[in-house]
Each structure stands twice: as structure tokens, then as C-alpha cells.
Amino acid sequence: MPESLIAGIPVHFPFEPYPVQRAYMEKVIQCLRDGTNGVLESPTGTGKTLSLLCSSLAWIRTRQSEHQQQMVKIEKADFSGLAGGATGGELSDLGKTMGRANNWGVPKVIYASRTHSQLTQAMRELKRTAYANMRSVVLGSRDQLCIHPEVMREQGNSNKTNMCKLRVHSKTCTFQMRVESRKDHPDLRGPSIMDIEDLVKVGQRLKICPYFASRELVPQADITFMPYNYLLDPKARKANKIELGNTIVILDEAHNIEKICEESASVQIKSSDVAMAIEDVTHIMQVFASGESQDMAGDEPKDFTLDDLTLLKEMLLELEKAIDAVVVDNAAEGTTFPASLMYELLGKANFTYGNVATIVSLLDKLVQYLLVASQQMSIRKGGTFTMLSDLLTIVFANKQDVMSKVYASFKVHVQMEESKQGHGKQQGAKQQGGWLGKGTIAAASGTSKVAKIINFWCFNPGFGMEQLLNTQVRSVILTSGTLAPLKPLIAELAIPVAQHLENPHIVDQSQVYVKIIGTGPDRQQLISNYANRDNPKYISSLGQTILNVSRIVPDGLLVFFPSYPMLNKCVDAWQASGLWADISCKKPIFLEPRSKDQFTSTMEEFYQAIRDSKGAVFMAVCRGKVSEGLDFADRNGRAVIITGLPFPPLKDPKVILKRRYLEANRTRENQLLSGQEWYNLDATRAVNQAIGRVIRHRNDYGAILLCDSRFKDASQVQQLSKWIRGHLGDRPQCSPFGPIVRELRQFFKNAEANMKLPDERETDAPLETVCKTEDEPLAAIPKLKREPGSNATFKSANESAIKVEMANSIKTWTPADYASAAGRKLGGAAPSAMDFMSRLDSNVSSIDFNCCTDSKSGSSDLVKIHKRERSSPTLPESSSQVSKKRYKLVENIKVEPSSSQAKAAPEERADFLRALRSLVTQDQFRRFGKALLEYKNGTYESFQDLMAILLDVLSAPKVRYMLVGMRKYLKNEHKDEFDRRVGSL
């Protein structure tokens, strides 16, 4: 690989670095050399991660070489000769050399990011470099690395963690017990870089625990990859035994670092948590009193006594009493108190700095006990004890000598908690009675107290960073594509910064088209503020804007909304008006789901649609998974539409208190933002992140359309990324919609003519395996989930895929027979007429709705069907056809979908499914699929169920042609009734 001398350090880079990459690496090396901190911004797509890894590891390698030379010099020294006749200068030089060798040491690198998918991307970048042979390891959770079938059956990370601890403590986990004897195995210590998936595979092969094996690799690793919380959460740092002395801490994707620092120091406890903890302690006491404890927990002696339980219960009862006594003036919104209230509440229950370590230890022992007991009887597994332990750990992490700072930076906000049924006064009165009663003090006293939620919120991110700096780290580097403005970030984190950088983008001006669209095609103002977001005219105009843009933008179009409620509101309105169907005719639409399982399958379908058809539209939400971590390079994202500014909820108590904190602590010297400036910046940073999904590398190109007139305001423009501001000019203005359409069409025409076509491997890779893994049968470990190994397509895409964290737990609505049907090879036995899902892997037919040429045969009303191979993307028949297309600008006219008489349902099953998916919501499509599969092998009742769903989903005039098209998939005995019911519509 080419070698470049940067800041005096030879750096091997996969290619000759661009000026922005060279500037970035120079800043990194300066930080490491001087032992200082840096805040570095470089836009997404500039090779930030690659530059970061190469520069830091090049410096580490240089230091290792220097260290070895110093050690050799010491070994060769003739001490006897020096002692007898050496000069004072020689002795002094040798002394300095020995001092450097002993105390200087070679620092380690800790690379942290927000999610494991981002860490996997970074490790994949490292594999491309000359530093791929340096020792590395990634730390993950038990949820991701554990291969013990019993532990993996537990629900929730907390239960898995506690069950793992229990098995390790009782020496019943054979995987963990083998780690010591096999930790030096070549497969584990080899030169290859192992991510989470690789560690799991090695663990399965060697039959050792990947979780504990990875911890064994840390001391010898040159670079360790881990998520943020392992660093910033003191409890996680202690649990994972992370030593930070003389380390270089790199926080990538650090645009959310303030929030992460605040959240790591915040905690919540509910009245119901305390009440359940009292019940759990009481239950254990009853077991002790009855003599059943030995049967429940085996022959091992207990780590606690009945006296310990009695004391803990008394403390919990006092805590419950103290919480009940808190007066909430505003029941609807809650009441805010000084931070001292939390210490007062805990103090009344005798939780103090002096005994908190003992109490936390007792709570952890009780969790272990309940985990064992829960194997034999139906009881809770100690989750409330874990919550209480977290509360005490976080609240008392702040030392007594900094309490004045704590009181200025924290607030307690008390909200009302909805009481659960069955926790009433009568029940408590019956159960109260002596120490073995389960009732609470409130119940015993005959009063009915309202349950509360106690929030202990931190508003000073400097607390988390200060704890990090106090561990004697060598350097801290914060980096992201969207950190600006840097001064207020540095001020809030209270971190001394010697190096800072705001890089321009690596792409040419001609590769990016940026415009502010202030009005839609009907001249309706586009502004997604509180006063206008419910305006039907605005929602319609926004839909018309997306429709017109979808006609021009090739391949993938991303549309980001400020929030999920706004996204759902627009979808409902567009489906009712017919705009949804019209957009779907141009490109199939995908919505960002909120659940992890659905998200993974939806992304797969989106990438497949990009390859198989004329593109697709993905509608998502700022701050969601799509906007934060996924790569939409090349065809996957040719344009991004931002529909509004995603401001935090104005009335949210946490937002109100954050603004008050900034106003109260802002001075001329500390340069903190005002409350309003922070509020605006929080929205703009989310926009910057969403925009960064599109331009992903040097040869990429795309359009950025800001569809909210507020983007022209100077306060908003100044908070956009520097490279975007360069495209908007000194005085940004809203552009008329008509000229934008012409310019946008010309932009893509020029880009397609002048830019190099993307490599098909890069384009098709992103989520083919990413988000999907399958269950593979393992003889030793049933139900263990791994990446698929049989599908050649998945194998070829694996190297460049973006791994979505915990993708191995995906479950979709598709039954097992759907998967087997979809996997039928071409040329095999023909599927039956009822096997509706069977041809998704075969060559399919598609309807070219964009075709503007007349068919030479048949009626002009017919839709021309084009055959295509699934393995290649759909292309226009010729470039001349594309240039002859005419796009009609919709203005002041409500667009109605074509009548059902002019449409016919697709003939092929796969095309029918795709067309149906684009016309209905995800929930409707899932209901349809489930009913259809039940009908396939079902009875007359299943036909009635299917008909009910069909009539509910497809009875509207604009989609009735799809209802008619369903007839041929029905059994013969049901077709007459189908005709009667459809005919009566």
C-alpha cells in the first residue's frame, strides 16, 4: 500500500490520500503525539473511519518500534563498565532511556461507537488496511456472544446476564470453563480481525464462550472495539474490567455524545418497582421461614441471612413511605424538585454513602438466588432488585466533595404512575401483618397513595466526560460527520481540546444538488411547524412534491419526517386521497418500522426493490435507525427529502429543564448555548445525520431537498454542516418548484452521463446478509442463530454488508412453508395454482408504468409486460427512450388515481404481491398474507376470513382491479360466491 509521511509518521493508506484525509490524519497524529484531546468533524463519505484507523495505528506501530529500540539499548548496556568509568553524561542518558522504557509504555487504542453495526463497519474498514495484522478485539454483550442454549432462552438482557453469572459462579457452564485451556488456540489468537459474528463462529467451533474469550484477548490487543456505554457508564466499565490508563479513546459518531453522557448519569425508579421489591424480599423471607430454601437453591450456603433480608425490607418500606409523601402539584405534567430530594428520599430509608456498596452487593446476591428459584417455581427473577441496584450505583457515583456541582447539574422530576389493577387497598390490608406480610405501609394505614415515578436527570454531559478523563487516558478524540458548531460542544463537555477540525466534503460541487423548497407544485407553503402540520392543504402539497420528485429521481429516494406521528398522519392522508397509489406507481414505497425484526426484513425488501425495479421510496424518521446508521450509497439513495425540522417536543419536561439549565449556567466565559440555540441545534444535527445517508464516497452523487421554508432562516442555515452551507450560498432562499424540477432533471442527466457507474458488488451488497441471518441446526447447541452459509448470494455480499446488530434474532410473519416455497429452484416442478408465494425466486414479469411509448400491437389501453431476469437490475430499453420522457408538473390540481377500468392486476404472482404491497399498509399486507396461507390448506371458514380482509383492503374503487385479480388464486368452489360479493360492491 502507498506510504505517506504525515506529521512525521509513515502512514500506509489503501490509496493516495485526498487533502481532506491528509488534514484529518495530521490532526489525529498531533493529538496522539502530544497527549491532547481533539474534536474533529469530517463529512460522511470522506473516508473518516479509514483515516482515523490508519493514522492512529500507524502512530502506535511507530511507538512500538521505538519502544523495542529502547529495550535493546538497555539490554546491550555494559553496567559494570559504566559503573566504573562512565561519565556523568552517559549515566544520565542511560537513566533517561530506562525511564522511558519503563514508564513510557505503548498506549492502547479503544475505538467506541454507538452501535455494534457501526463497530462492524469500522472493523471491515480495518481489514482493508496494512494494519489488518495488528491485534484487535471487539467487546459485545452476552446477548450477542453467549452460545449457552439455556442462557439464550432467557428473555431480556438483564436475565441473560444474571443467568450467565449464576452458571459461571456455580461452574455449570462448560463453554466458559474451556476458555482458560483454549484461550491461546490459533483460531482465537490468529492474525485475522474478528467481529461479533466471527467470534461466535470460533466459539462454536472450539466449544468455548465467545463472551469470556474476547475478554481474554483485551490485554494483548493493540485496538479494542466497544460500544459507548462500556466506556461512559462506570458500572459497565467496572463489570467489563476496562482499564483506561495510558489509552487513546476514540469516540466515533460522537454527534450524540452529550445525550449519551447525560443518560449514563440519569436513572428512574417507580413506586411499583419499590412495591415489587418489597414483595420479592418478603417471598424470600417466607421461604427461609418455611425451611424450603435448601430445596430451592440446592446445597450451597446462602450469601445472605434472614437478618439481612429483614433490614433490607425495613429500608424499602421506609423508601416507599418517603416516595408516597412527595407532593406533586401538577398531576398532568409532574413537578420538578432540586437534586437534593433524591438524596433526602434515600437518606430517610438509610441508604447512605457508607452502606451503599454493601446494599448493592446484597441486591446482586438476591438476584442470583431468585434466578435459581425461578427454575422450580413461578416467581419473578429479581428485575426490581436490578433496578434498585442501578439507582444506588448511579446516584452515589457522585462523590460527596462535588455535591454543589451535582445540585447545579441534576434535577428530580416526579410524575404520576398509573396504578396497576390488583394493587389496591383491600389486597394490601389482607396481606399486611408482621414481617412476613406483603402489604405496604400505605395499605396498612388505610390510606390510598398514588404511585409515582421518580426521575433523577443529569443535564451536564461534562460529568460523564470528567469521569473518563479522571482515569488518566492519554487522549480523547471525538469525531463525526456532524459535530458543528464545535465551540458549544466543547464547552458543554468541559473537555480541554487542543486540536479541532471542520473538513469540507470530498466530492465536487457538481456531484451534489442542494435546494430549499419553500412551496409545493400548487404554491402551498411547505412548513412543518406546529401550526401547520395538521393543515390538509400542506399535507397534500407535500405529497404532490414527493410524487413529482419520484418521477425524476432514479433508483432510491429517501424521505425523512420529523417524527413517527407526522409520518403516520401523512401516510393516512395520502392513502385516502389516492396520492399514495400514484407515488407507488412510480416507485414502491417502504416505511421505517419501529420494531427491530420488521426493520431488518423491510430493509432487505427495499434493497431488493432497488435492484429489481425502477427504484423505491423509503420513508423514515429523523433520529431513527435509517437516519443514524445505514449506508445508502450509489443507487440505494440518489436523493433525500427532508420534510421538516425535527425539534424535540416543546412541552416535554426534560426539554424544558435542559433549556432552563443552559440559561442558568451560561456565561460569557464558558460559551454555552442558550436554551433556544440548543433547541434549534438538536433539530439541525438530526437533519445533518439524515442528509449524510446519501453521499457516501468520492464518486457518489445525489440531491438534497429541504422541504421546509424555515431552512432559509439564518439561524438554521448556520447550524447545517459546513459542506452543505457551501451549496446554499451566502443568502439561501426558497426556490420556486418549477425551476427546481428542470434543474433536478438536468442534474441527474449530467451525473449519469459523466459519473462512473458504481461497481455492482458495492451497490448490491448493503443488506443482503446484513440484516438477515437464519437458524442453523447445531448438534451441540440447538436454537443457536448464525449467518446463513448455503446461499451463494449471501456469501458474496457478506464482506461489504452492513451488519445490523442482533440480526440473528429476526422473526417475520412468514411461515416455514413460505421459505421452502420461495427457495424452489428454477426448472423444478411447477407450483400448484394455490401456491401463491412460490415464484419469488424465479424470473418474473414487471409492469413498466413509466413507459411512454405506444405498444405496436394490442389495444392502447393494455399495459405492456416486460420480461426481466431477477439477477440484474431493470434498465430502460434504450437511452433514447429515457430522454424522450415528458414529466407533467402537477399544479393546483388534485391528482386522482387512474380508474380501475384502465388497470389490470399483474399476471405473475410475484408482481401481484409487489403491486399489492405498494398499495396497502404493512399491517394490511401482513394480515392478507396470513389469511391467504391459512386459506391454502383451510376450510370454508378460512375463505370467509380471507374475503373479509380482501373486501376491507381492496374494495375502494381505485384498487378494486386488484380485488378482481385475486379471483384466479381462489379454489373453484369459492369463485361463484366471490363473483357475487364483488359484483354487489
Curated annotation (Swiss-Prot):
ATP binds at residues 42-49. CDD domains: DEAHc_FancJ (cd17970), HN_RTEL1 (cd13932), SF2_C_XPD (cd18788). One of its GO terms (molecular function) is DNA polymerase binding. It comes from the Eukaryota. Residues 7-303 form the Helicase ATP-binding domain. Its main location: nucleus. GO terms for cellular component: nucleus. Keywords: 4Fe-4S, ATP-binding, DNA damage, DNA repair, DNA-binding, Helicase, Hydrolase, Iron, Iron-sulfur, Isomerase, Metal-binding, Nucleotide-binding, Nucleus, Phosphoprotein. SUPFAM superfamilies: P-loop containing nucleoside triphosphate hydrolases. GO terms for biological process: DNA recombination; DNA repair; DNA replication; male germ-line stem cell population maintenance; negative regulation of DNA recombination; negative regulation of t-circle formation; regulation of double-strand break repair via homologous recombination; telomeric loop disassembly. It catalyses: ATP + H2O = ADP + phosphate + H(+). InterPro entries: ATP-dep_Helicase_C (IPR006555), DinG/Rad3-like (IPR045028), Helic_SF1/SF2_ATP-bd_DinG/Rad3 (IPR014013), Helicase-like_DEXD_c2 (IPR006554), HHD_RTEL1 (IPR049909), P-loop_NTPase (IPR027417), RAD3-like_helicase_DEAD (IPR010614), Rad3/Chl1-like (IPR013020). [4Fe-4S] cluster binds at residues 146, 164, 173, 209. It is found in: Nucleus. A motif (DEAH box) lies at residues 252-255. Its EC number is 5.6.2.-. The modification Phosphothreonine is found at residue 874. The keyword Signal does not apply. A probable ATP-dependent DNA helicase implicated in DNA repair and the maintenance of genomic stability. Acts as an anti-recombinase to counteract toxic recombination and limit crossover during meiosis. Regulates meiotic recombination and crossover homeostasis by physically dissociating strand invasion events and thereby promotes noncrossover repair by meiotic synthesis dependent strand annealing (SDSA) as well as disassembly of D loop recombination intermediates. Belongs to the helicase family. RAD3/XPD subfamily. This is Regulator of telomere elongation helicase 1 homolog. It comes from Drosophila erecta (Fruit fly).
